[in-house]
């Protein structure tokens, strides 16, 4: 399929949208010409305790990076997500919890959620947690995790959610960095039929003497498994809730008070504690959730992410609840008990909007029509994609098979550091190009620069930067502002550097070509790994592909491809040659893979991102310098890839 395919805006989408093409153009223009006026107006969508006077006070100067929005205003996030909805929709369902086991589900109304949050906020205070203290949340995808997040915001504590798949070492590092006072966890997590010993992992993490800031562990009962207990330190969630009072006034917080820390892996060294603050983040989360998904009251919204990632923070919890939405919290994985799980959940809860990741889409696509066998799917109105660029083939499959060729797709591009979507087509405003993140959201000013930082105009490819601040932007890295400046503002002076490369086409649409450190340079030709991967996945027998550079005596860099075949397809030398020719035909001779290695599985983080760093090391036979693989979803994959690589070397 050519990258130039254009899917026009659906008439149904235009008929019901908040933002048609003309509205987008007018609002976008206003947002970049007069950001103060634009955001002053948009900020009225949330409740303020003390209204702000100042709107935007921001500097990207690398000697003085300082980002403040609505700084003299005060508010409370939990009030905005709960209390203000009670009069109108107290009995509406706020959270639909869908357990790992399809038989488990629970509905929690706004009134019930409000009561639980007030109780747990009081319980936290009883454990000596106060404004400005950091609470680490290491939990499965259960309602208590959302209650814990909102309870922190109610009393002004800062939460740091750590994904439940991270190892004790990774957890300890994240506790030490922010000097956490309390850890909230569960006896075990359940995911894809497997149990994770969360409480045991916390115990293990806390054997590190540097975690001495932790005073208490609060434990939810998820499976009832036997766990070790330290009576001086450990306390049951249920015991606290039984005695907690159900009224708790929300704490008045400054717009620039910290809301949460979320750790994201640095390409080197220790994880970065990305810090988001209260006012700007909530305004931006709420506005993007409404406009990107054209969210209307009463709709059922399902973002499949984990709350351990920024997507879960912004589009399971804060955006939807600020907007009074019904949001789905899914404990499981898309292919358990079988590959029809996503389709079944859509029908069971009459989901209107589905927001998921390319890795989940490709897993379904590998099973073909079986993924939606027997499903109705008619409740769906809009699809979304997040996490990495989606290859055009996967986009098209998602559009035709899951969305029945009638649901627009919002292919959103953003980062932990950006708080919420920065680029996406809007369903009622922009024709869709499969694989393109399309246009910037309101207030976002993207640009392409060459390696010297010179702006490139028109249709071109380069480093993607953002020229001015937006309210959802991270303010710093916790405890390390210098690293924040060095990472994002030093490379290109006066600009926020995203770390991504991008191409802008003749229509002004943006195409993310992958991390700049994932760029291949083959005989002087720059090529994004995403481009080669897309071509490979376009082959009918290929489920997934990961491309890395390898040293090549003649070309400088060669192209090394790891290929996962569709179920039922056998690898062979003939197929290997066929795939090489296929990519050559799709992109050109310069993109012909030098090596194809069959890979039944790829090393992925728990959020589904492929760890190309590990793949580069294996391709170079540097097996003993792989670094930390504890954060992988399935570390066993690595050993298999090493053995295959060794046998290829020997052959």
From Swiss-Prot:
Needed cofactors: Mg(2+)
Domain of life: Bacteria
GO molecular function list: acetate-CoA ligase activity; AMP binding; ATP binding; metal ion binding
Known role: Catalyzes the conversion of acetate into acetyl-CoA (AcCoA), an essential intermediate at the junction of anabolic and catabolic pathways. AcsA undergoes a two-step reaction. In the first half reaction, AcsA combines acetate with ATP to form acetyl-adenylate (AcAMP) intermediate. In the second half reaction, it can then transfer the acetyl group from AcAMP to the sulfhydryl group of CoA, forming the product AcCoA.
Keyword entries, A-Z: Acetylation, ATP-binding, Ligase, Magnesium, Metal-binding, Nucleotide-binding
Gene field: acsA1
Entries under CDD domains matching the protein: ACS
EC category name: ligase
Protein name: Acetyl-coenzyme A synthetase 1
GO cellular component, one term: cytosol
Catalytic activity: acetate + ATP + CoA = acetyl-CoA + AMP + diphosphate
Residues where ATP binds: 387-389, 411-416, 500, 515, 526
Enzyme Commission number, as recorded: 6.2.1.1
Disulfide bonds: none
InterPro entries: Ac_CoA_lig, ACAS_N, AMP-bd_C, AMP-bd_C_sf, AMP-binding_CS, AMP-dep_synth/lig_dom, ANL_N_sf
PANTHER family in the record: ACETYL-COENZYME A SYNTHETASE (PTHR24095:SF243)
